A protein has these predicted regions:
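Active-site loop segments of alpha/beta catalytic cores
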Residues: 1-53, 57, 71, 75, ...
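N-terminal entry elements of small recognition
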Residues: 128-132
Length: 368
């Protein structure tokens, strides 16, 4: 493609992405899920079978940036109807690490988990308040910022950079307390409501600061920012999530989690909230979320063991009647079913096709 043709294509994408955020009927964008090779640290953990506690000193930023540079060498700027955005080491549970949890690498599991911090529950609020006021001194926060600074210098002129995978306030508090402990406390609100709300509020505020720091380090791309899916927007543009929703009832979700999703979404110009298909019909209260916040779009990740696409269609269409919708498929069966319904969606849709890549390194980039 000539330089002129490439520029025309990129300009056309910017306009298509504006249509997406406006939920314009008939806007169907498509992209393909990259393989695990696009996350070199995940590949390294797998190849070297790295197991056990993972500390900041073990993350060699110089090597990581060089590995990311080589992973994207020869990649096109475009991924279907989106831009190829690049996050920094999404295998790392960054938010959990920043708030003081212990990280553990799972070797052939090609992932990491976070275990509770060595902090008494009664001291957690003070710990988080101090952290919020002194984030720049946190070793993981500095590691993340330095990583994005270096990545911007190496690839920022070629690709848009996007913030890394960041889990939600409930996920963060669950990691601090232990997930069973968190839910148990939710079930006894008389004793725990104020305590939990303070922790959730502080974690939401920390999320906002960490996300904004990354966007500042990545700098603008075509006078805007790209999110996790390569969707451009003319303003601060983030992805939010809350996998802790899998452990709670609709009542607990509304009482404890939804207010802080609203707080996060309202802190940015554009935001898309990630939901799992197994819980989108009953737990995630996207209706109230949509009414009470500035949330820009919703994403539904079609879990391999979740409901069939046909069983979800009524919900997907209802969501799309309110907001732009992002759909991520993981199987060929889901892919065929979604494509059959492209003409049924009332608003704008971004569809991520499953990768056809095979082999040990074709594990899907985790978005949980």
């Amino acid at each position: 493609m000539s330089d002129e043709g490439r520029l025309d294509k990129e300009t056309g994408l910017l306009q298509s992405h504006r249509h997406f955020w406006n939920n314009s009927p008939g806007t169907v964008l498509r992209r393909t899920q990259l393989t695990g090779n696009s996350d070199p640290l995940r590949v390294h953990i797998y190849d070297e079978n790295i197991k056990g506690e993972f500390t900041p000193e073990m993350l060699d930023l110089e090597k990581l940036i060089d590995d990311i540079k080589h992973a994207y060498q020869g990649h096109s700027l475009l991924n279907g109807d989106t831009f190829q955005s690049i996050p920094l080491a999404p295998v790392v549970p960054w938010m959990e690490a920043i708030i003081g949890c212990h990280l553990y690498s799972l070797g052939r599991g090609a992932s990491m988990v976070a275990n509770p911090a060595d902090i008494e529950p009664g001291d957690l609020a003070q710990h988080l308040r101090h952290l919020l006021d002194n984030l720049s001194e946190n070793v993981w926060f500095k590691k993340l910022g330095d990583g994005y600074q270096a990545l911007a210098e190496v690839l920022g002129a070629k690709f848009p950079l996007t913030h890394t995978l960041m889990r939600g306030p409930g996920d963060m508090v669950g990691a601090l307390l232990g997930h069973e402990n968190l839910v148990g406390r939710m079930l006894k609100p008389a004793d725990n409501k104020d305590f939990l709300n303070e922790l959730l509020d502080l974690c939401a505020k920390i999320y906002i600061k960490v996300a904004k720091m990354q966007l500042e380090r990545t700098k603008e791309f075509k006078e805007g920012y790209c999110n996790w899916w390569g969707l451009w927007a003319p303003g601060l543009n983030v992805r939010t999530q809350e996998d802790e929703a899998a452990f709670v009832s609709p009542k607990l979700y509304n009482e404890f989690l939804l207010p802080y999703h609203i707080q996060e979404a309202d802190a940015f110009d554009y935001s898309a909230f990630h939901m799992h298909s197994g819980y989108v019909r009953l737990i995630y209260n996207w209706r109230d979320f949509s009414k009470k916040s500035n949330i820009s779009a919703f994403e539904v990740a079609l879990d391999p063991s979740g409901p069939a696409v046909e069983d979800l269609m009524e919900t997907l269409l209802e969501i799309n009647s309110e907001k732009p919708l992002i759909i991520d498929a993981t199987t060929d069966e889901q892919d065929k079913a979604i494509k059959k319904h492209f003409g049924d969606f009332p608003g704008s849709v971004l569809y991520t096709e499953p990768s056809s890549a095979q082999g040990l390194l074709s594990f899907k980039q985790q978005e949980t």
